[in-house]
């Protein structure tokens, strides 16, 4: 079986400030990795052949200054969160917080990685590689 695969990764520090719950901010993905039959748009992937895809993502958040902050993150398809990808965490003041997921979902159109605020929060992604988004087609070609 031929697989489609595409990865984006981010390697620079990004800052996010949320003032209320329900705010959405896209994670910037500035480096492309090898791909096959998947388009590369700024900060998103373009799915050319609809089908079932394995989605893997990871976001590394640097320790925050203010305790008891929470955040959600996940993958969006055509601007809407894919529910099965949403992860939620309290942000650590001493260690890196990692939000990650791996699911299989039907994809078409564009996908990206984004935060969904659960309350007020201020955070930075870690230095170096701090976010990845990979999709790989798992359904057979017809």
Label every model-predicted segment.
Residues 1-142:
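Extracellular jelly-roll beta-sandwich "head" domains, especially the C-terminal globular C1q domain
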């Amino acid at each position: 079986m031929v697989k489609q695969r595409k990865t984006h990764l981010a390697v620079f520090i990004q800052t996010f400030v949320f003032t209320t719950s329900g705010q959405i901010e896209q994670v910037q993905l500035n480096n492309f990795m090898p791909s096959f039959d998947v388009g590369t748009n700024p900060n998103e992937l373009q799915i050319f052949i609809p089908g079932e895809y394995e989605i893997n993502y990871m976001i590394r958040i640097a320790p925050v200054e203010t305790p008891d902050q929470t955040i959600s993150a996940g993958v969006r398809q055509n601007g809407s969160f894919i529910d099965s990808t949403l992860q939620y965490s309290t942000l650590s003041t001493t260690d890196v917080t990692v939000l990650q997921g791996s699911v299989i979902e039907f994809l078409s159109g564009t996908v990206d990685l984004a935060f969904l605020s659960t309350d007020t929060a201020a955070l930075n992604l870690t230095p170096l590689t701090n976010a990845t988004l990979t999709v790989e087609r798992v359904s057979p070609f017809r």
